[in-house]
């Protein structure tokens, strides 16, 4: 089994090549997608400026109040069904789900989170409608049909929650016992000094998180990849905009993070 995460940058630029490659993996994959760029676009069209929180360590996450949550769910639903429709056009039986459907992904709401403000001070703020995964009904995700999962979970109180897409993909892969997790974005992998780093051990990945060239979403990807690799799960960070991107990633393209 493999888990393929289609990053928001790919979703918003051109997911065609990923979707066209998925029929080769319809019987052995689970797909997770992002789409934060569409959320940002919709919010701005509504006159709402997207808000982000910086956490100790430099990780950045979206602040999701109730109004943002509504837009988030709307955007993810559009992306999800668009991918599923494209797969059906290719002859692939696919089922689009949020984590709330069938109770597939259950999460606990983060009531409070620690952030770093614009003055560099740490403080605790309301967590909004963001969750941490506590359970995944993996048997409901196994193919057939090919499942396409959006990063929306449900709490024990019946609340819809925003879940980080990369983290959800990792949690799905871990619970499925997948062999590989393929993270597809609009870059060729981890780039240090202008070149792609082809292979890393978990320990090396953890160390590189401190590198000034590693920023934003790549920092989160490396931390998660290191954790996954320690469990024996190979993580590939690769480009989803190239021809046959899944084939390419599994054949050595991108950055491969392995146990060691």
Swiss-Prot record:
Site (Transition state stabilizer) residue list: 5, 221
Top-level taxon: Archaea
Pfam families noted in UniProt: AA_kinase
InterPro entries listed in its UniProt record: AceGlu_kinase-like_sf, AcgluKinase_fam, Asp/Glu/Uridylate_kinase, LysZ
NCBIfam families documented for this protein: argB, PRK14058.1-4
Cellular component terms (Gene Ontology): cytoplasm
UniProt-listed SUPFAM superfamilies: Carbamate kinase-like
Similarity comment: family membership: Belongs to the acetylglutamate kinase family. LysZ subfamily.
Lineage: Archaea, Thermoproteota, Thermoprotei, Thermoproteales, Thermoproteaceae
GO BP annotations, alphabetical order: arginine biosynthetic process via ornithine; L-arginine biosynthetic process; lysine biosynthetic process via aminoadipic acid
Primary location group: cytoplasm
GO molecular function, one term: acetylglutamate kinase activity
Catalytic reaction(s) noted: [amino-group carrier protein]-C-terminal-N-(1,4-dicarboxybutan-1-yl)-L-glutamine + ATP = [amino-group carrier protein]-C-terminal-N-(1-carboxy-5-phosphooxy-5-oxopentan-1-yl)-L-glutamine + ADP; [amino-group carrier protein]-C-terminal-gamma-(L-glutamyl)-L-glutamate + ATP = [amino-group carrier protein]-C-terminal-gamma-(5-phospho-L-glutamyl)-L-glutamate + ADP
Name of the gene: lysZ
Protein name, as recorded: Putative [LysW]-aminoadipate/[LysW]-glutamate kinase
Catalytic EC class: transferase
Organism: Pyrobaculum neutrophilum (strain DSM 2338 / JCM 9278 / NBRC 100436 / V24Sta) (Thermoproteus neutrophilus)
